[in-house]
């Protein structure tokens, strides 16, 4: 009898023995092929039942309901209540929620006029298209009720971006834990593969994103909403302004995460948005892993940045998420911000001091901004950097007060 291979973890010996119709699992014997098939079907039914329970909110009616839109409005305004447009919307929450409900259920246009601007983020120019607040409410309800339950349940442990309870600090703590485990086994001898995609958001093929979303979302009436939000952002790829695009972009390369963790055999891995790393003690294994990542990325329509994608030794240290990582002689893991980050912050403080000298900004506002940035350094080994920046900040403030 032919033995069928299933996606489950079934041992080779069990499958070989399953070809015998008389074999059982009793007293050390293996199951027959019929029992293997029956168990596989039960597992599939259980998975489908669990998936349906987890995505029960991902329906057209629930996503566009007045209650979901109201909850989304209060969630979306949490950090931007000082804005005039937000205050106008929240002063008439009931009427605005009803209007959004009619737009979503009536097949009308759910996107508004974009406000386009360019900003410099950590030395990189980013073109942003900001949507009006009423559209952000619609994006929030789609993200909360559809994308998060349909996507995040299948994310790997190392996927750190755009999830509740995760973020940059989660990614940093995870990498520290993995580096500590590696040192206990191999010392500082080992290798790390660092990958970064070229122009990640803009290069994501829109057709493949929609196809992936269609496979995850059962209610197909939701798909026109996603298509409208994508078309309003830009002509190709995904824009940086919509929350829905952030969720779709994080989940787009989840297939690669699963392959690395489950099939590559590498020691450790993690990803924050489009910044990926893989750790292993075998250099040849990492090279073959890189070749497979390139192949899978090409299938997804993405291209790895040749400058930022490389393999380096853990002994010499590496840079990830704008932080310098390395081992000491005793195995302690040191994490420090790169010098470019500190230099850029000094330039920023000088620019703010000039605004304060002209009376366009108060030092109370500058102090709040500086202490917010300073608080992030406390999570790293940057005591000397903090002392140096404090002295520089006090020098600028004293010089400004004497003018």
Q: Where do the protein language model's features map onto the residues?
A:
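Reverse-transcriptase-like RNA-dependent polymerase core
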Residues: 102-124, 137, 144, 221-233
């Amino acid at each position: 009898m032919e033995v069928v291979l299933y996606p489950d973890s079934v041992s080779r010996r069990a499958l070989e023995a399953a070809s015998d119709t008389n074999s059982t699992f009793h007293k050390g014997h293996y199951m027959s092929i019929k029992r293997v098939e029956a168990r596989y079907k039960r597992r599939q039914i259980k998975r489908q039942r669990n998936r349906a329970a987890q995505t029960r909110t991902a329906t057209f009616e629930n996503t566009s309901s007045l209650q979901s839109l109201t909850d989304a409005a209060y969630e979306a305004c949490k950090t931007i209540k000082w804005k005039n447009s937000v205050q106008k919307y929240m002063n008439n929450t009931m009427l605005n929620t009803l209007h959004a409900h009619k737009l979503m259920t009536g097949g009308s246009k759910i996107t508004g006029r974009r406000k386009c601007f360019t900003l410099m983020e950590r030395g990189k120019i980013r073109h942003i298209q900001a949507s009006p607040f009423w559209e952000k409410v619609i994006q929030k309800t789609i993200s909360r009720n559809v994308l998060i339950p349909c996507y995040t349940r299948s994310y790997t442990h190392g996927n750190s971006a755009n999830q509740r309870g995760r973020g940059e600090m989660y990614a940093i703590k995870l990498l520290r834990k993995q580096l500590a485990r590696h040192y206990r086994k191999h010392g500082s001898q080992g290798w790390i593969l660092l990958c970064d995609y070229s122009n990640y958001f803009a290069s994501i093929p829109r057709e493949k994103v929609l196809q992936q979303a269609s496979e995850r979302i059962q209610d197909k009436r939701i798909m026109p909403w996603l298509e409208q939000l994508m078309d309003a952002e830009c002509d190709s790829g995904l824009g940086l302004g919509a929350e829905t695009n952030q969720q779709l972009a994080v989940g787009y390369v989840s297939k690669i995460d699963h392959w690395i963790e489950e099939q590559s055999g590498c020691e450790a891995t993690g990803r924050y948005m489009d910044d990926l790393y893989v750790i292993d003690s075998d250099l040849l294994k990492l090279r073959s892993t890189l070749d497979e990542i390139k192949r899978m990325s090409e299938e997804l329509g993405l291209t790895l940045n040749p400058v930022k994608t490389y393999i380096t030794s853990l002994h010499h240290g590496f840079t990830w998420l704008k932080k310098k990582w390395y081992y000491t002689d005793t195995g302690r893991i040191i994490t420090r911000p790169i010098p470019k980050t500190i230099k850029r912050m000094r330039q920023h403080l000088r620019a703010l001091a000039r605004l304060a000298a002209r009376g366009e900004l108060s030092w109370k506002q500058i102090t709040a901004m500086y202490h917010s940035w300073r608080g992030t350094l406390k999570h790293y080994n940057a005591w000397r950097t903090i002392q140096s920046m404090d002295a520089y900040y006090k020098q600028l403030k004293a010089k400004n007060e004497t003018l």
